[in-house]
Design a protein with these regions (language model features):
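Active-site regions of metal-assisted phosphoester/phosphodiester hydrolases
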Residues: 1-104
């Protein structure tokens, strides 16, 4: 399964190779240290920065597999990013980021 995710990450990097501003968010089913995430983070910035928090399972979060990524880093200003403590709506905790798109 990891091999498929790595291929998908590489394909996303190709699709978004132009330096237009982009946001990629969701459940990646991959922890930060995985080869999948490392492939993505070679081209994308993690909205959590160094403040990553676990997102799953919602009742007792132990792993982070939900992300908000941006690129290119030079076009985005991170205002805030956090995991929201809302364990009822899903089996994952939601991730929230407030971003500002910088003008060229």
């Amino acid at each position: 399964m990891e091999a498929i995710r790595i291929q998908q990450a590489q394909e996303l990097n190709k699709i978004f190779a132009e330096r237009n501003p982009a946001i990629l968010a969701g459940d990646f089913n991959a922890v930060l240290s995985s080869e999948t995430m490392q492939s993505l983070l070679a081209e994308w910035s993690d909205s959590a920065g160094t403040n990553s928090a676990p997102t799953i399972p919602a009742a007792k979060p132990a792993r982070r597999i939900d992300y908000i990524l941006t690129r290119p880093e030079s076009r985005w200003r991170m205002i805030t990013s956090r995991v929201v403590d809302e364990p009822v709506a899903s089996d994952h905790l939601p991730v929230l980021a407030v971003l500002e798109l910088k003008t060229k």
